[in-house]
Amino acid sequence: MSRKSSTEYVHNQEDADIEVFESEYRTYRESEAAENRDGLHNGDEENWKVNSSKQKFGVTKNELSDVLYDSIPAYEESTVTLKEYYDHSIKNNLTAKSAGSYLVSLFPIIKWFPHYNFTWGYADLVAGITVGCVLVPQSMSYAQIASLSPEYGLYSSFIGAFIYSLFATSKDVCIGPVAVMSLQTAKVIAEVLKKYPEDQTEVTAPIIATTLCLLCGIVATGLGILRLGFLVELISLNAVAGFMTGSAFNIIWGQIPALMGYNSLVNTREATYKVVINTLKHLPNTKLDAVFGLIPLVILYVWKWWCGTFGITLADRYYRNQPKVANRLKSFYFYAQAMRNAVVIVVFTAISWSITRNKSSKDRPISILGTVPSGLNEVGVMKIPDGLLSNMSSEIPASIIVLVLEHIAISKSFGRINDYKVVPDQELIAIGVTNLIGTFFHSYPATGSFSRSALKAKCNVRTPFSGVFTGGCVLLALYCLTDAFFFIPKATLSAVIIHAVSDLLTSYKTTWTFWKTNPLDCISFIVTVFITVFSSIENGIYFAMCWSCAMLLLKQAFPAGKFLGRVEVAEVLNPTVQEDIDAVISSNELPNELNKQVKSTVEVLPAPEYKFSVKWVPFDHGYSRELNINTTVRPPPPGVIVYRLGDSFTYVNCSRHYDIIFDRIKEETRRGQLITLRKKSDRPWNDPGEWKMPDSLKSLFKFKRHSATTNSDLPISNGSSNGETYEKPLLKVVCLDFSQVAQVDSTAVQSLVDLRKAVNRYADRQVEFHFAGIISPWIKRSLLSVKFGTTNEEYSDDSIIAGHSSFHVAKVLKDDVDYTDEDSRISTSYSNYETLCAATGTNLPFFHIDIPDFSKWDV
């Protein structure tokens, strides 16, 4: 549609009877829509196009457009300022109210605890005790992985359960010792002890573990208070799954020597593949401990299968008509499954007591846990030995990553499953404060456990307060059951560890899902697992981080920019699909009543309505699947280049965009001033023209060249198969679609300036640069600062858009009409609109809310 420039927009038809034209225009549109519907049903493709020369009711469509749209009031769009940004994004966060809200958010318990009731309390009590019965044996087992005494696992368990309930935003997560963090703690202890003489006693494993807990707590708390939880999102899910799987594989093979009774012969701190080799090599050294390891392991798996799968299937099969009995039986199986670790340990501890009591350590036939101090004997402020922090510094990053990633991944997962919001920043504060306070009880790093959290969720826990009951169970065990802990077989604890950690192994289904979703994710997962197994857990973690960051960088550096073509489409409202219903579903297979309903539904559909528009889609739509692959995409008018940037326009990718756009311009258009040098040797090396075979080679190979004379000074484009060439058009318009650009920077804007200079020099004229779909006011500000978007004498004077300036208009509605109501909105006629206004600034003729239809322009 031809429009005048913004300086020439005036009301030229003030005396026209607007109401008459509005009525005529509505009648015309209704008649046109009816003709289009008839044309589509008759298969006449020409009816898709609007016949602008046809007159209806004494006025043409173009005349109506002139009356209704050509005259719009000027709208001077201003650039965004720092004050506006402050008022919009910062000001509301610096008030006393926001400060109070921030302080309250640090203690989520304030919001929900006043509503606590008996129903919640009962559910939390059941869940807390159930998880506590699992946590006690697991915590002692995981302390064994961390090369610590069992009591340190109990210390970490009870303090984690108590403190986390005050700061948590997840009701399901259970804080305490976990397998992967215990393995990382053991690695840190081993690496630090290597730096000290063997005979020193000042720096011990418990001191190193507690110091690690302190440092992890400080960092996690700081990240949470500063609201830097978004940094956790930089590591992808497949990367986390990779090092978790590798770590689980490491733990399982590290526990097999203890399971078989020859753990003193295998160094489980080596690389996993070496542990596997040495474990298999020493199988002949198996002792009686294998009985207390293999049998409990088999029992645990059979118990889990029976109570979790087979028993429930039997209940559904034999009590199908008795749902209450079936539900009670399922509840019994559920709690029986939850208690399997505790029951197995109790049974085999009793057997161990019967064969090891009143015997010295040398005479005992199996290895047992030994003395576990009763109560909280280690409470107090710890003293950090000199030089310990510097010796631990290299181990801190990997430890913090394991601590934070595992917890955030678990909490967000259960938040999605159980429909509540988890705040990552607050969760960082929760685990940070938990570990900070844990240092006073000489605990080692604790974080969220997946298996215990899943159990807690299945117990229908209602609030985080259930952690208090869980901590109470652990505290009760510390004071009352330590004498019984003395006789727990170490092989049985290893069986419990293997059984629990095996759930961390990623299944083949998840791996296949990674492959189907994104093959690169699957590759990173597999490589991370191999690095963790054949090198170390730290290297696996660092590779996972580097891979995630590299993928982000590569996606930015190699943008998915697309050159666009146009296609005319129509949105069909209430279409009548022309297909045989029987081909989809046989009406003979439907009941008569339902069959009548289906037929009646098809018959009462309203008449289709069409909304025509021009859409810009990539030329490779067959690959991108943005459009039906059978649709033909027409190129822009000659001399017009339309390019869509697929991501943010920054210093990382601006050079690549520059090259892609300028190469396409040289391919599709010709120079504005032809090179007419007499000698071919005088042409520039980067534009030598068409290559001609020397006469000697022609005679040698009897090469027959086409005799048609061509101008060698013209750039050669894609010709037809018979060797003919054509003269390419001059470049007139470059349109950049910024609808997917979230931000720009100074380097990228400067590359646009350089592109404009190069293009103007190549075309030997001022070329129009149009921008569509800009979604940020700061992008507009950046472009305007270098004289894009508006007319100026240097790059784009008024003459280059004379006769074809384009603006989108919007309809301003009256205040007395409820446009949120569907019926009111449909029944509202054009006369209910108050006026028309420019959708974008009339002072910015090169900025558009959508890509203009350049085929209507007189360029």
Swiss-Prot record:
Transmembrane segments: 94-114, 116-136, 148-168, 173-193, 206-226, 234-254, 292-312, 332-352, 395-415, 428-448, 468-488, 525-545
Compartments, as annotated in UniProt: Membrane
Keywords annotated in UniProt: Glycoprotein, Membrane, Transmembrane, Transmembrane helix, Transport
Principal location listed in the UniProt entry: membrane
Glycosylation site positions: 51, 93, 358, 391, 630, 653, 718
Any single biological process term in GO: sulfate transmembrane transport
Any single Pfam family the record assigns to this protein: Sulfate_transp
Single Gene Ontology MF annotation: secondary active sulfate transmembrane transporter activity
Superkingdom of origin organism: Eukaryota
Domain STAS: start-end pairs: 630-808
Membrane topology of the entry: Multi-pass membrane protein
Family: Belongs to the SLC26A/SulP transporter (TC 2.A.53) family.
Protein name according to UniProt: Sulfate permease 1
Organism name: Saccharomyces cerevisiae (strain ATCC 204508 / S288c)
